[in-house]
Amino acid sequence: MEVVAGCYEQVLFGFAVHPEPVGDGHRERWAPVADFTHHAHTASLSAVAVNSRFVVTGSKDETIHIYDMKKKVDHGALMHHNGTITCLKFHGNRHLISGAEDGLICVWDARRWECLKSIRAHKGHVTFLSIHPSGRLALSVGTDKTLRTWNLVEGRSAFIKNIKQSAHIVEWSPKGEKYVVVILNRIDVYQLDTASVSGTITNERRVSSVTFLSESVLTVAGDEEVVRFFDCDSLTCLSEFKAHENRVKDMFSFETPEHHVLVTASSDGFIKMWKLKQDKKVSPSLLCEINTNARLTCLGVWLDRRTDTKESPPAAAEPAPVSKEQSRRNKEESGHAVQEEEKQPKPDTEKCSLTGDSNKPTRGNSLVSAKKRKTVEMLEKKRKKKKIRMMQ
């Protein structure tokens, strides 16, 4: 496995982690080894996502950078957004969804690296998005104070809910039966069947990251050193532990055959991996820690898996041809308010706008090599300087 982390210093770190042999009476420990540092962007990194082959990073430089973890090479950059990349999510190995401060949500073919669809999702910034485990739905929140549900089968808005405040995190549970929406230090728990708030969890500080460990247990980190475990049914805090000496910026969790592992990154520059006990009331044990000496912003873990069946899109979300009329209708409907939540459509392989393939890449949607990207950036800077001199 490989821990990857982005920082304000424009660098992506990679650390290979291997379990150490455990002797009798000794605590389990993992050994991290520095694998690579990649100066991927010209501004601070803001988001990272991983699948079984690639690591992608988003930045304030408005680009999405791709790194091939199998070959350990720079795979180029995606240039479509006109704003800071705020969120990146893979669904399996075929699709990447990105959100940015330009209000757009883009769906990318993660094989040919082409933009399949671009949606005007929010009137303000897109602050976060989350994909349902089935691949049929997605949720997004933005600075326009709305929570939006997207039908990924037909490629259009399904429901818009005004939430009166700007949420900065939304996250589905592992089975997709509930989801949470985070506003400052408040976590609202929603049930999918009712689309209404079933309860509210209040954290002591502003929440910076959440991750579900199970359908009912939610891990919460905020602008403090402490990580807490909450029960989403009883809305109570099961336990808490001090993870860092400074605020926790991001978290990532995954399962091994033996136990759950929680990875935390802090603005103190440390990345820590924790072994979680089955009883969440018992404090976790530290597996390893990594000092990056950087101001960390985002975190991910690349697991070297040959197959990714658990996250594969369902048959209804597989790419299929889209008629011109259907495409035009989807574009008109995307981003418009829907007064009532629509009934979920039956799976139809003939309709798949968001995850449909495009044989003709449009301008600005295809993969850009690292060399070409740097040339474009240099020309853009010269153009801006020339414009300033002409104005003077």
Curated annotation (Swiss-Prot):
Its main location: nucleus. Residues 325-351 have a biased composition (Basic and acidic residues). InterPro entries: G-protein_beta_WD-40_rep, PAK1-Kinase_Regulator, WD40/YVTN_repeat-like_dom_sf, WD40_repeat_CS, WD40_repeat_dom_sf, WD40_rpt. One of its GO terms (biological process) is maturation of LSU-rRNA from tricistronic rRNA transcript (SSU-rRNA, 5.8S rRNA, LSU-rRNA). GO terms for cellular component: nucleolus. Residues 355-368 have a biased composition (Polar residues). WD repeats lie at residues 40-77, 80-118, 121-160, 202-240, 243-284. Keywords: Nucleus, Repeat, Ribosome biogenesis, Signal transduction inhibitor, WD repeat. PROSITE patterns: WD_REPEATS_1 (PS00678), WD_REPEATS_2 (PS50082), WD_REPEATS_REGION (PS50294). This is p21-activated protein kinase-interacting protein 1. The gene is PAK1IP1.
